[in-house]
């Protein structure tokens, strides 16, 4: 297993960025050969790539499964393009990051070997960008995703969220539902080919997002 930190100038974000990469380059059995299957893993709200590596057994899983893991930092922006701020976070994680890491590292360029996943806000980012860039990603993994952004505001004790903040990212609540940002709308569309495979999970005690995840699950089952 190899661990890398890469700093480069992002065109989409118009600033320098740091990414963490785990490669299964030296498997004990010598069975993992490049180009590697790749998971782009998105941190949640207020989290960083370092936190995910610290709290999760990503290095071991990379070695066991023979998969590269690429982790950008989150920015509390739900991985959206925000032209008014000249910040294109969706373009960054869904397009630029894939292209840059494929040029730098021995990663597979095949769709069937390229996945996106995330936790909480990162889970929303994975759902949104996995669907948007479905020609790039064949699988989406969403762990306790904030799959309905505006439902977060229904939780009185939810820290760090405000309607003004969400309106700055998604527009009004009325504009959000039925738009491409609404995961129930996007993932149940009938006019879409090449839909990624989806793994969706959430603990029942995760009261911040459980109702939203259940809502998405019900919508998918009705499809």
What are these language model-derived features?
Residues 1-223:
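Non-catalytic cap/lid and distal C-terminal segments of serine-dependent acyl enzymes
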């Amino acid at each position: 297993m190899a661990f890398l930190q890469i700093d480069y100038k992002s065109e989409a974000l118009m600033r320098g960025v740091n990414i963490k990469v785990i490669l299964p380059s030296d498997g004990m059995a010598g069975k993992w050969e490049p180009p590697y299957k790749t998971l782009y893993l998105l941190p949640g709200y207020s989290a960083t790539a370092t936190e995910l590596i610290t709290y999760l057994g990503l290095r071991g899983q990379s070695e066991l499964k023979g998969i590269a893991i690429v982790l950008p930092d989150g920015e509390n922006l739900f991985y959206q393009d925000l032209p008014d701020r000249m910040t294109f976070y969706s373009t960054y994680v869904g397009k630029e990051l894939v292209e840059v890491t494929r040029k730098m590292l021995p990663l597979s360029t095949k769709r069937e070997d390229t996945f996106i996943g995330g936790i909480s806000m990162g889970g929303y980012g994975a759902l949104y960008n996995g669907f948007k860039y479905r020609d790039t990603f064949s699988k989406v993994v969403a762990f306790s995703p904030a799959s309905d952004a505006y439902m977060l505001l229904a939780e009185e004790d939810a820290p760090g969220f405000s309607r003004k903040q969400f309106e700055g990212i998604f527009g009004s609540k009325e504009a959000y539902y039925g738009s491409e940002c609404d995961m129930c709308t996007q993932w149940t569309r009938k006019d879409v080919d090449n839909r990624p495979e989806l793994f969706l999970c959430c603990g029942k005690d995760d009261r911040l997002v459980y109702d939203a995840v259940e809502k998405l699950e019900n919508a998918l089952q009705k499809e």
